[in-house]
Amino acid sequence: VLLLAVPGSGKTTVLVTRLGYMLCCCGISPDAILTMTYTKAATKEMQKRFVRLFGQDCPQVPEIRTINGVSSKIIDFYTRTHGSGSAFTVVENEGELAKIVSDLYRELCGEFATQSVIKELRKGIAYVKNMMLGKEDLGELDTGFDQFPDLYAQYNLALRQRRWMDYDDQMIYAKTILENYPDILAHFQDAFPYICVDEAQDTSKIQHAI
């Protein structure tokens, strides 16, 4: 089912109501439903709405995660079942990533980057990863910085040297696991026969692929 409607028209309420219908009327186990939304704040809001509407009839709230929460779940399962822990740490401090971009910009052009420049460059980096672009596509991006391909390559190298990954790398890692380990893909397909996505219009190419 694809629900298209203007902002503020009640799409999320419809999705929460559908979850209640699936659990209370159809008898579907909450463990069989994976519900995804765009932000952590949105997951909490959906859980609150569900409890308000169906708390007495459906005391067990279905799993609601962000796409990065799903990616983390995939990586954790891979670690447990294949005995290979992730050697990389997801960087939660955005300032650390911004500093890497700032330092690289200064090295490449000999100038200090303004906050707006850093923001635009980080948006470009995220866009490349979310749209799964190749090296040949980097020069065509309108980032306002001619040396963006070099900065992008050095940014990823800097993360690898620190054994770090950003949230976009986390999705790439999860997608790679699903593509290369059919048993893990089958596990999640069997575990969650029902998938509900809120704010689907904000889904990027790699998020859709996962």
Please give the residue ranges for each predicted region.
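P-loop NTPase Walker
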Residues: 1-84, 186
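Active-site catalytic microenvironments for nucleophilic, acid-base chemistry
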Residues: 21-25, 49-53, 77-81, 98, ...
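ATP-hydrolysis module of ASCE/P-loop NTPase motor domains
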Residues: 59-62, 80-165
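Short acidic/histidine-centered micro-motifs embedded in hydrophobic/aromatic stretches
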Residues: 70, 120-124, 173-174, 191
